[in-house]
Amino acid sequence: MSITKEFDTITAISTPLGEGAIGIVRLSGTDALAIAQSVFKGKNLEQVASHTINYGHIIDPKTGTIIDEVMVSVMLAPKTFTRENVVEINTHGGIAVTNEILQLLIRQGARMAEPGEFTKRAFLNGRVDLTQAEAVMDIIRAKTDKAMTIAVKQLDGSLSQLINDTRQEILNTLAQVEVNIDYPEYDDVEEMTTALLREKTQEFQSLLENLLRTAKRGKILREGLSTAIIGRPNVGKSSLLNNLLREDKAIVTDIAGTTRDVIEEYVNIKGVPLKLVDTAGIRETDDLVEQIGVERSKKALQESDLVLLVLNASEKLTDQDRALLNLSQDSNRIILLNKTDLEQKIELEQLPDDYIPISVLTNQNINLIEDRINQLFFDNAGLVEQDATYLSNARHISLIEKAVQSLEAVNDGLALGMPVDLLQVDLTRTWEILGEITGDAAPDELITQLFSQFCLGK
């Protein structure tokens, strides 16, 4: 799909396939009204006012057969998401009826939209920039209200405004430096230019570094904390997973080795999406299937943001327990002493002091796990500050890091006394990198790749 403004009319089903109360088939483009009218029996859609909902029936124009009773929303350019004429046909939910209407629209001249093409048109037509387009998908994929709050702020343009303002300031600085270089007749112009460049570069770097400090929190809220639940067999890992999920997703029995693979689930812990990985018990085993699960568990431990190490408080520490304590000591780890409802035999003096005694059976102290996670990753601060702008997208984070590196190169050059005109190159590069975030300077291949990750109909 070429990166140009496209004027053909596209269509797609915008609701999930399957049974439901309603289904929505969307059209966008110059001929959206004419194509919709060709299959609609009711008011003349080409003559109704913009942003109205119109009752009628979808019919097969060849046979006159009624396909469904519908409500049709008409929205005229440019006051639409794509800045093109948009029609949304609200049908009864169901695979057959929505597909039948989609095929009718295609036969009448619409083209099947590619994934993300509606949002791509909004970007190409200047309705949203790249950060706002990405925020659309973040809202769809948000697993908690906090993640949704960050995505909505980004869609509203908070990150775009910050980036655009910074780019404009960089441009102003480059222009001033250029003027000073072009008019060197003043004796102190070189000193003035160096001082200006040093002051502004440090200002830009400070701003971007402050933005990067939000990345850890933002990325966690967007993508979730990858959390490995580890422990030797039969200490209560799967029961803990089920307790956190509040539903039976892992197999729980009294037979060691029941969880023979890695089970992944998401759970909302005070607004933080935890990607819980219930690992097979880590122990030496001759069972090939279970051995594969154990190896995957070790890998999950290495790749996790957080480790929940479950020990059995009703038994003495084993060599396997000690091995797991050593294996996880460099991780963000929470030690959980399970089965405290039974007589305790575990040697507490051999454990770090920050363990949490719990009973999955009686639900004792489960809430303390949530508090400890907040302490570990958010320093007990609020998860989302209302007026703050957060970085949460890995692409944005990477580009901001590159921009900071370019600014550091300017500062290093100033310290070495390099000519100002050479330092302009790195400052210009910073301006270009920031433009990639909003899409002002993003390569065509990147734009195509980003929108291809969207769902159909969006």
UniProtKB/Swiss-Prot annotation:
> Where is K(+) annotated to bind?
N234, T253, I255, T258
Give all residue intervals belonging to the TrmE-type G domain. 224-378
State the EC number(s): 3.6.-.-
Q: Which CDD domains match?
A: trmE, TrmE_N
Q: Which Gene3D superfamilies match?
A: P-loop containing nucleotide triphosphate hydrolases, Probable tRNA modification gtpase trme, domain 1, tRNA modification GTPase MnmE domain 2
Cofactor detail note: Binds 1 potassium ion per subunit.
What does the entry give for GO biological process? tRNA methylation; tRNA wobble uridine modification
Record has DNA-binding as a keyword: no
Q: Where does Mg(2+) bind?
A: S238, T259
Q: Which GO terms describe its cellular component?
A: cytosol
In terms of InterPro entries, this protein maps to: G_TrmE (IPR031168), GTP-bd (IPR006073), GTP-bd_TrmE_N (IPR018948), GTPase_MnmE (IPR004520), MnmE_dom2 (IPR027368), MnmE_helical (IPR025867), P-loop_NTPase (IPR027417), Small_GTP-bd (IPR005225)
Subcellular localization is given as: Cytoplasm
Keyword rRNA-binding in annotation: no
UniProt binding sites for GTP:
234-239, 253-259, 278-281
Main role?
A: Exhibits a very high intrinsic GTPase hydrolysis rate. Involved in the addition of a carboxymethylaminomethyl (cmnm) group at the wobble position (U34) of certain tRNAs, forming tRNA-cmnm(5)s(2)U34.
| Assembly behavior | Homodimer. Heterotetramer of two MnmE and two MnmG subunits.
Q: What is this protein called?
A: tRNA modification GTPase MnmE
Q: What is the lineage of its organism?
A: Bacteria, Bacillati, Bacillota, Bacilli, Lactobacillales
The coding gene here is mnmE
